[in-house]
Amino acid sequence: MISISNLVFRMKKNAVGLATIAILSSMVLVTLVGAASIYAGKKDYLMSAAPHDYSVSGNKVDLTSTKKLMDDFLIKTGEQANEEVAVSYLFFGIKNQETNKLTVFTKNERKVVPKSIVLVFSQETFKQLTGKELNLSSNQIALYTKNKTLKTQKSLSIDGKNYQIHRQLGDFINKKVPNIYKIIVSDYSYLVVPDIKIFESSMKGTSIAQATYVGVNVKDPTHDAKKNLDLLDQIAGEATKQLDGQTPGVPESYFSANSRYDAEGMVNGFVGGTFFIGIFLSIIFMLGTVLVIYYKQISEGYEDRERFV
């Protein structure tokens, strides 16, 4: 009974110290796990942002023009493409959602933050990326979505136009076409439609936009990587200047270049810095925990000496 009461007395007296030890230990674990998770997710993010060694993206330009830039780049560098992906798609932002009814931003709405982003591909592009056919009828679509509500729906309404969801898909553009909007919103969807031109014409007056992507993998991506990216940047910049109907300083149609080498450098800089800070903070928290335990034991020792000696 005496030993139990003594234990309770000590726990009450040292409650602050025990709580500090528990908090610091928890902070060590949280910081380590968080930093390790970010570092481990680096590869997946990189493959999502830059799935190919070199790529050219276009906004409101045709796929043929985008592909020509990549062909010019390969000729000038002497690189040979082991793998190539060339696609054209549409994208738009969602202003509001009520169950399976989506409202799209209008063409004149600027500086908005969408609730969700939708990328639209033709079934021909889907077959090109996956090797599978869908055979969609005129009012049918196939859907991949991160939206929990839409995953259970049988139909979808987009600005009052109704479509039947033929089937739910997996992430068919992963490691093939970049989705840069993942860093803006966590809620996004991919639609596959039977005819992308008909779908685009049905969305007149909305903020829907057209984009192209051409990506290639080469035999030795590290060979002259910086020099090659500078060349690809130059080719894309010169091609953008030659596009018709540009507003000076604010190009609506443009080309942009990217490389996995460049993206990897930026990601490594961010992730490496975060990982270092995580390790550094973990060491500080661990030292704090050790010091609290050490001085707590010393104080208890002096207290016992005064009581029993």
List the model feature ranges, each with a label.
Residues 30-52:
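Hydrophobic alpha-helical transmembrane segments in integral membrane proteins
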Residues 16-38, 265-306:
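Hydrophobic alpha-helical transmembrane segments of multi-pass inner-membrane transport and secretion
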Residues 1-8, 301-309:
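Juxtamembrane inter-helical linkers in multi-pass membrane proteins
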Residues 2-18, 56-69:
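Cytosolic juxtamembrane regulatory segments of multi-pass membrane proteins
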Residues 46, 52-59, 63-278, 284-287:
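Basic-flanked hydrophobic alpha-helices used for secretion and membrane insertion
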Residues 11-32, 70-74, 78-82, 89:
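Acidic, Ser/Thr-rich low-complexity segments on the non-lumenal side of membrane proteins
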